[in-house]
């Protein structure tokens, strides 16, 4: 294992320990590396422990372990927000430091970092990687602001996943300043230069205020991403249009070439080939196995849309999978599920903006619809929804 020195979170979080998982490619000799991080206390205070102050000696270790114990816990209170921010910065700092170290070992310079490395900001959680790379270039490597900013803005790309205002991540300036003061000062400098440039070009204070990265004593992480990244995309055509016409309208009008659409999908060899053996067998039988390397091959299924035999087999596969899941739930939790019901599943944290309550109301509405239109009498209905 390698140890990487962290900065910005104090002595408690001195050590960042990487743990690597190797992921093999499909029908190839390629192996990718997935690097995870664990926080550890740099040094155990044996002197304090020997003096009998066990609680204080161990408290630093407990706090350190909390950073990577549970990712993104509930943040509807001050402690949760602070821990979440510390987690974000810890992971960003560890990853940026690792990227820089590996690049330096090969090229001996960061002048060409943006030509050899692409860093993807997938939603706003890793946004602190932007000012962290600036910090490394400015403080550790002695780059000028303009040169460092050129490297940063040509290295990062941003994918936006939501346009709901309440889901666009914002951090309180006081909290950000207390957790990682140097990073906060870099963000403020980025914003001041950005707003100055906007004012010189538009002479419109309302526009400048709206496009500012800092507003109402909060740092708008999505706005920072849009400003600092050379590419900004939504995950569906309609989503990308909303980004351009509503959410980031002024930013789009200012830098239209960086906005694009990249339609989301699934890793189908993972979530189809590996996870759904029955469906994979049916697909291979009907259209061959070409879809395992080319997803466009799945369009060949269209000819079977009215094929009763195929539809019946598909229904059986779905039922078999539900039975398999119900068996797992019973064995693990002792809960019996009705496999004739519709399974409505959300792998999401419970939060207002996730709309779980709205989804629950929809389930009730569909249930009432089934009672009303699919049964001679509501008492005879066997339709339900999990």
Where do the model's predicted regions map?
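Single conserved hydrophobic/aromatic residue that forms the stacking wall/gate
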Residues: 2-13, 373-386
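Active-site cores of enzymes that catalyze phosphoryl transfer or operate on phosphate-rich substrates
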Residues: 6-7, 11-124, 171-235, 247-349, ...
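Short acidic, glycine/serine/threonine-rich loops at helix termini
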Residues: 48, 130-133, 160-168, 244, ...
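Alpha-helical support elements that line or immediately flank enzyme active sites
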Residues: 93-97, 132-141
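Active-site-proximal binding-pocket segments
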Residues: 127-129, 143-173, 195
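N-terminal alpha-helical segment
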Residues: 129-130, 343
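Substrate/cofactor-recognition hotspot
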Residues: 236, 241
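A conserved nucleotide-sugar
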Residues: 354, 362, 368-375, 379
């Amino acid at each position: 294992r390698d140890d990487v020195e962290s900065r910005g979170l104090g002595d408690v979080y001195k050590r960042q320990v990487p743990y690597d998982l190797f992921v093999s490619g499909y029908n190839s000799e390629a192996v990718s590396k997935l690097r995870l991080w664990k926080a550890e206390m740099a040094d155990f205070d044996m002197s304090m422990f020997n003096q009998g102050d066990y609680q204080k000696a161990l408290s630093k270790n407990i706090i350190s372990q909390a950073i990577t114990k549970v990712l993104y816990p509930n943040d509807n209170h001050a402690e949760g927000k602070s821990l979440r921010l510390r987690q974000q910065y810890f992971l960003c700092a560890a990853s940026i430091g690792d990227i820089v170290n590996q690049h330096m070992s090969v090229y001996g310079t960061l002048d060409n970092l943006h030509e050899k490395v692409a860093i993807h900001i997938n939603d706003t959680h890793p946004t602190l990687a932007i000012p962290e790379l600036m910090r490394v270039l400015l403080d550790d490597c002695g780059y000028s602001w303009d040169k460092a900013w050129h490297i940063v803005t040509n290295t990062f790309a941003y994918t936006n996943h939501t346009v709901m205002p309440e889901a666009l991540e914002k951090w309180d300036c006081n909290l950000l300043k207390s957790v990682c003061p140097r990073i906060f000062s870099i963000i403020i400098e980025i914003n001041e230069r950005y707003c100055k440039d906007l004012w010189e070009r538009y002479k419109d204070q309302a526009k400048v205020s709206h496009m500012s990265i800092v507003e109402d004593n909060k740092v708008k992480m999505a706005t920072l991403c849009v400003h600092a990244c050379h590419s900004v995309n939504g995950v569906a055509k309609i989503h990308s249009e909303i980004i351009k016409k509503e959410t980031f309208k002024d930013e789009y009008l200012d830098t239209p070439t960086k906005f694009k659409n990249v339609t989301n999908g699934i890793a189908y060899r993972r979530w189809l080939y590996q996870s759904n053996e029955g469906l994979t067998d049916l697909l291979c039988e009907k259209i061959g196995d070409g879809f395992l390397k080319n997803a466009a091959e799945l369009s060949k299924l269209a000819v079977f849309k009215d094929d009763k035999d195929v539809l019946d087999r598909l229904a059986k596969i779905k039922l078999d999978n539900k039975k398999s899941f119900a068996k797992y739930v019973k064995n693990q939790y002792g809960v019996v599920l009705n496999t004739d019901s519709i399974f409505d599943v959300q792998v999401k944290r419970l939060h207002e903006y996730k709309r779980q309550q709205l989804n629950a109301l929809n389930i009730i509405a569909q249930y009432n619809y089934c009672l009303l239109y699919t049964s001679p009498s509501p008492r005879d209905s066997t339709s339900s929804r999990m």
